[in-house]
């Protein structure tokens, strides 16, 4: 995998379990073919990544799916028991949502990016 591209976007506001929360993370992305690995370093603020670390977990946290219409995919997932727990719309056509469902070990990430 690699090379890795690092992003340090600073604090950003997210809807986190129904509340607005500023969260800061450092990110690095590496690819091999069509597979991408994202390394996330939590820095500050409430988010699912901090929950994961506070619970003593390490390793794979979520699985990302690229979607054309974030809102419709979130609604579809909610219809089968998923709850949206974290997300934001960065700009028109650029948004993210994390979803969880009781009993599922991984969080789902839906990512809409019409700017790529």
Map each language-model feature to its residues.
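A cross-kingdom feature marking solvent-exposed beta-strand/loop segments within repeated
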Residues: 8-22, 45-50, 59-60, 92-95
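Vicinal oxygen chelate
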Residues: 27-35, 52-69, 74-116
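Extended intrinsically disordered, low-complexity coil regions enriched in Ser, Thr, Gly, Ala
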Residues: 1-8, 53-58, 68-90
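Short, well-structured hydrophobic secondary-structure segments
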Residues: 3-6, 10-13, 19-38
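Residues embedded in well-ordered beta-strands within globular domains across many folds
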Residues: 5, 64, 111-112
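Amphipathic N-proximal alpha-helical interface segments
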Residues: 31-46, 111-115
């Amino acid at each position: 995998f690699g090379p890795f591209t690092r992003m340090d976007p600073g604090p950003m506001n997210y809807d986190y379990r129904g509340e607005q929360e500023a969260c800061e993370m450092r990110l690095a992305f590496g690819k091999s073919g069509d597979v991408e690995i994202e390394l996330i370093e939590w820095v500050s603020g409430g988010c699912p990544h901090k929950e994961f670390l506070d619970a003593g977990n390490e390793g794979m946290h979520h699985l990302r799916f690229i979607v054309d219409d974030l809102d419709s995919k979130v609604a579809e997932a909610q219809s089968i028991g998923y709850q949206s727990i974290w997300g934001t719309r960065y700009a028109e056509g650029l948004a993210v949502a994390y979803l969880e469902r009781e009993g599922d070990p991984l969080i789902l990430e839906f990512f809409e990016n019409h700017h790529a």
